[in-house]
């Protein structure tokens, strides 16, 4: 029998300044939480975005 594969989960990237959901990603479970600097169109600048699960 083969091992079952871990399926990718849908996660949201939430802006730390405004709390808005600006991006969605598909990521395999496990590992550290993402924290990326992405563009926020409402503020018109790059801000830190943190991972939040569905």
From Swiss-Prot:
Pfam families: Ribosomal_L33 (PF00471)
Annotated transmembrane regions: none
GO CC terms: cytoplasm; ribonucleoprotein complex; ribosome
GO MF terms held by the record: structural constituent of ribosome
GO biological process, one term: translation
SUPFAM superfamilies: Zn-binding ribosomal proteins (SSF57829)
UniProt keyword list: Ribonucleoprotein, Ribosomal protein
Keyword hit for Ribonucleoprotein: yes
Domain of life: Bacteria
Family membership noted in the UniProt record: Belongs to the bacterial ribosomal protein bL33 family.
Protein name: Large ribosomal subunit protein bL33
Species the sequence originates in: Rhodopirellula baltica (strain DSM 10527 / NCIMB 13988 / SH1)
Gene that specifies this protein: rpmG
